[in-house]
Amino acid sequence: MIKRVLFLTVGILSLMLAVCETKAINNGKKENKMKTIELTKADFLKKIVDYEKNPEEWIYLGDKPAIIDFYASWCGPCKMVAPVLEELAAEYDGQIYVYKVNTEQEQELAALFNIRSIPSFLFIPMNDKPQMAMGAMPKSSFKEAIDGVLLKK
């Protein structure tokens, strides 16, 4: 009887150690997949364009092409597009940035781009003028725009 209890205790402890070690290994892995990046006005001025310094000229400050999603937390179509943008951020990791601007919190940015309908998307190529698109789009349309406008494949 004592042997059974001892074996059972040792077995349970071994199992617990194995599970804990597996969790530690998984937690140690770096997740390289890029996520969408939330922008505030201050971030926008540093990463996208400093419209206060250069109000008449578009000078993109980024080092990669970008998409900016102008959204609101209550917007149904915005919620439908959000996972698609997360997938695209991971899929095009290292090639483009995918930013998000909450139009409720960043009303100045929304007004600057004359956002009247959400979701709205600003596609920013490296050496060209940005292009705006309005309304929810399927993933295939985003990929077309990324490949054609941003990456010029």
Which stretches of residues belong to each language-model region?
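N-terminal targeting signals for export/organelle localization
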Residues: 1-45, 153
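Structural signal for short hydrophobic segments within the conserved structured cores
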Residues: 35-37, 97-99, 130-133
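A short beta-strand-turn-helix
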Residues: 40-65
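Short loop/turn elements that flank and shape the SAM/SAH-binding pocket of Class I
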Residues: 45-46, 106-108
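Short pre-active-site segment immediately N-terminal to redox-active cysteine/selenocysteine motifs
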Residues: 63-66, 70-74, 117
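Thiol-based oxidoreductase modules, predominantly thioredoxin-like and allied folds used
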Residues: 70, 81-89, 93-107, 115
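C-type cytochrome heme c attachment motif
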Residues: 73-80, 120
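Non-catalytic, surface beta->alpha helical segment in thiol-disulfide oxidoreductase systems
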Residues: 117, 122-153
